[in-house]
Swiss-Prot record:
Biased composition (Low complexity): 529-539, 614-624
Comp. bias regions, Polar residues: 221-230, 562-576, 625-643, 670-686, 695-726
Pfam families, per the entry: FHA, Forkhead
Function, in words: Acts as a transcriptional activator for ribosomal protein genes (RPG) that contain a HomolE UAS (upstream activating sequence) in addition to a HomolD promoter element; HomolD plays the role of a TATA box in RPG promoters that do not contain a canonical TATA sequence. Binds to HomolE elements with consensus sequence 3'-ACCCTACCCT-5' (or its inverted form AGGGTAGGGT).
Descriptive protein name: Fork head transcription factor 1
The entry's DNA-binding region: 291-385
Keywords (A to Z) from UniProt: Activator, Cell cycle, Cell division, DNA-binding, Mitosis, Nucleus, Septation, Transcription, Transcription regulation
UniProt cross-references to Gene3D superfamilies, sorted A to Z: 2.60.200.20, Winged helix-like DNA-binding domain superfamily/Winged helix DNA-binding domain
Stretches with biased composition (Basic and acidic residues): 434-443
Record organism: Schizosaccharomyces pombe (strain 972 / ATCC 24843)
Compartment(s) of residence: Nucleus
Stretches assigned to the FHA domain: 39-94
Region (Disordered) location: 214-291, 411-450, 529-743
Organism ancestry: Eukaryota, Fungi, Dikarya, Ascomycota, Taphrinomycotina
Gene Ontology terms: biological process: division septum assembly; positive regulation of ribosomal protein gene transcription by RNA polymerase II; regulation of DNA-templated transcription
Length: 743
């Protein structure tokens, strides 16, 4: 393939112009020639230009993010990462402060910008400049001038190297007048001090290949007047005197194949590698207007699996998705929130915080190895715990794995909650039973005793048998379900995390510890549920009794302020409570004659009105009306709650002898000389005299001869009206007026 050499623009336009470069950085829409031993790349600053290659204004890219330099001790080009977000080199993540070698065809991705590092054909086999005959001394002899499209300034004049081996490093490209963009003329393209060449996409089309036999017109294109165009493969020149024709049958198919790959949307980015055999190959960029038929969870899973470290931050995940699926690249950043929600809510993704001294911001996210098989196809396939009847007997391993996955899924959230709130375990460590005994409910914490759930045994991860004694120890009979779950967890760790432990033992141990803690908490919860029904029932009964007692308190005997205690000199026998009617009346025997000749009511007291009054001489004590009324009031008031009548005073009338609770006590009218009390109901006043008890226990009366009571003697000492009939009205009645109610 004939190639033209381009010389410096300071020479005559008729002569050929040459551009000397050590390597080329091939971007998506432009190319940059490395003409110095060190090139810096980073974000374009608004005030100054601190880097040689500007990668855009994205905040994810640092101002000086990476540096490509030639290592003299190793005699090779290397890239050193200086940005906090790192870079991807051939799909492998390179952290800040590390350097990796570069070979011809190495793919580098920084943020959303990716490019290829290319060397001349003479050094493509091993990627070392030593094989091309260039020594470190010859590299330091000349001042290399360079300029880039984004505003780089020339640093020196062109220096011609006469060594034939160094001429092999020249990158010469065909620039025809008909291949230039519209509106450009040969005169506009001749600008001095322009040493950076940007390729045109139509440089190797069919028209150019057909006209290679004609002497071409060589032009120098300025970076300020050329557009951002797609890169084309370079051709190594073999002479500096004239163009050398090459076999077009060899180069033409290579160019055609490259064009077909660009049309089909294929890329040489790290996404071309196979992510996982179950994920149906590498992702396809597809059309920018058509959304990929993949769920967000599946996109995240593919991203994490493609990363060699198997962990990425949220920003790196979104950036990787945008670089590999053109639809999300041209969409507003609102879909980043969907990625964040899927990472937080989906149990298949595990959050790993940064170390204390680790640079960068944000936590890392990784995919749980036990969920890799659930991302087959285009969507996240959720598995549920199968029932025993639905589990096929021909596949016991699959049933055990599904059961273990269900137990782990339910226990992860509980494990996080218990680790965040360890005080709740301490408060629930002991419960009080109905018998007053203290029973251990559950251990205070799983890791407080220093027992690690996962230990290394013969270079393999294994469960610590001491860790599960709380759930299946000597305190109770072995639980078959717990033993089976623990054995399934051991099988899962050996099968899924065993290979990962060889590469990253710390990460595999952390995942195994999380699974063991979740299983232990699940078993403890089931153990508490089995032991607690009877205890919970007893606690509910006690709680119900306490609530009813608080709502309906028992009535207490409260003394009334107007009720006075009875006098200690009077002993009153309380009548027992009887629900039936009064007993039949039995007339007592004839009373014996008392020394007193006064007459009283002949009808004795009914049963129930009993009193113990000492016998003595019958005499009427003289007292004023006020003192008699006050004494009667106090005695009646003190006995009204007993429903009995005090009988220490003789009756002077035939009033009803039973007093019911419905009888009302009339208030005492207050006069100038004291209180005055009315009788109960229609009861009349009675005099103050003694009652003598005979030998038979009956009361002595003077009515056995049928004589009436003398008015003057019965009401002796009391101020009564002059009319005796008024004084005795309601107080005394003849025995034959009404018959007794007890006969």
């Amino acid at each position: 393939m004939p190639v033209a050499e381009i010389k410096n623009a300071t020479q005559q336009p008729s002569s050929t112009n040459r551009v000397q470069a050590y390597a080329k950085l091939e971007f998506e829409k432009f190319s940059f020639f490395v003409q110095t031993l060190q090139v810096t790349m980073g974000r374009k600053a608004s005030n100054s230009s601190d880097c040689d290659v500007h990668l855009g204004d994205t905040k994810a890219i640092s101002r000086q993010h990476a540096k490509i330099f030639y290592s003299f001790p190793n005699q090779r080009f290397e890239i050193s990462v200086m940005g906090k977000n790192g870079a991807f080199v051939d799909g492998e993540f390179v952290e800040r402060g590390k350097s990796v070698p570069l070979r011809s065809g190495t793919r580098v991705q920084i943020g959303q910008i990716s490019f290829s590092f290319l060397l001349p054909e003479g050094s493509e086999e091993d990627g070392h400049l030593k094989e091309t005959g260039i020594t470190p001394l010859s590299l330091q002899q000349g001042k290399i001038a360079y300029s880039d499209e984004f505003g780089g300034k020339p640093t020196g004049s062109f220096h011609t190297v006469t060594s034939n081996q160094e001429k092999d490093l020249l990158f010469s490209h065909i620039k025809h007048e008909s291949d230039l963009p519209l509106g450009l003329s040969p005169a506009d393209t001749n600008i001095s001090n322009a040493t950076s060449i940007i390729e045109h996409p139509d440089a190797a089309n069919a028209h150019t290949l057909a006209s290679l036999n004609q002497p071409p017109k060589h032009l120098t294109v300025s970076p300020s007047s050329i557009q951002r165009l797609s890169p084309q493969p370079y051709v190594r020149p073999t002479s500096d005197e004239r163009p050398i024709e090459t076999d077009s049958s060899v180069s033409a198919p290579k160019v055609a194949n490259h064009d077909e790959e660009l049309k089909q949307g294929k890329s040489t980015s790290p996404s071309d590698t196979v992510l996982h055999p179950d994920l149906n190959g590498s992702p396809d960029t597809g059309d920018a207007t058509q959304k990929p038929n993949l769920s967000y969870a599946n996109l995240i899973a593919r991203t994490l699996i493609a990363n060699p470290n198997k962990k990425m931050t949220l920003g790196d995940i979104c950036e990787w998705i945008a670089n590999n699926w053109s639809y999300y690249r041209h969409q507003p950043p609102a879909w980043h929130n969907s990625i964040r929600h899927n990472l937080s809510l989906n149990k298949a993704f595990i959050r790993i915080p940064r170390r204390q001294n680790e640079p960068g911001k944000g936590s890392f996210w990784m995919l749980d190895p036990s969920y890799i098989d659930q991302f087959e196809g285009n969507f996240f396939r959720r598995t549920k715990k199968p029932t025993p009847s639905a589990t096929p007997a021909a596949h016991p391993d699959t049933a055990r794995e599904n059961e273990l996955a269900a137990i782990q899924t339910k226990g992860i959230s509980a494990g996080k909650t218990e680790q965040l709130n360890p005080q709740k375990e301490t408060s629930r460590s002991k419960t009080h039973t109905s018998r007053g005994e203290n029973v251990e409910d559950r251990p205070q914490s799983l890791l407080q005793n220093g027992i690690q759930p996962i230990i290394m045994r013969d270079g393999k991860l294994a469960l610590n048998p001491e860790f599960f004694k709380n759930a299946n120890g000597e305190q109770q009979a072995p639980n078959e379900q717990a033993v089976q779950a623990i054995s399934l967890l051991q099988q899962h760790i050996n099968k899924q995390l065993g290979p990962a432990a060889a590469n990253n033992p710390e990460q595999a141990t952390a995942i195994a510890n999380a699974l063991a803690v979740a299983l232990a908490q699940k078993l403890q919860k089931q153990q508490t549920q089995m032991q607690g029904p009877q205890q919970v029932q007893q606690q509910a009964k006690r709680r119900k009794a306490y609530t009813s007692q608080q709502l309906n308190p028992a009535p207490t005997a409260m003394p009334h302020p107007n009720i006075t205690s009875p006098s200690p000199s009077i002993s009153v026998t309380q009548r027992p409570a009887v629900n039936v009617g009064p007993p039949p009346y039995v007339r007592p025997s004839a009373p014996s004659k008392l020394p007193d000749t006064r007459q009283s009511i002949g009808d004795p007291l009914p049963p129930g009105a009993m009193a113990n009054v000492s016998a003595g001489p019958s005499s009427v004590r003289s007292s004023s009306y006020n003192s008699t009324a006050s004494e009667s009031k106090s005695e009646i008031t003190s006995h009204q709650n007993l429903h009995t009548i005090p009988i220490n005073k003789p009756f002077t009338s035939d009033r009803p002898l039973y007093s019911s609770p419905n009888d009302t006590l009339e208030r005492v009218e207050t006069g100038n000389q004291g209180q005055r009390m009315n009788s109960i109901g229609n009861a009349s006043s009675f005099s103050k005299r003694d009652i003598m008890e005979n030998e038979n226990g009956s009361f002595d009366t003077n009515a056995k001869n049928g004589n009436n009571v003398d008015d003057s003697s019965s009401v002796r000492g009391m101020n009564l009206p002059s009319n005796s009939s008024d004084a005795l009205r309601g107080v005394k009645r003849p025995l034959d007026e009404t018959s007794s109610s007890y006969t």
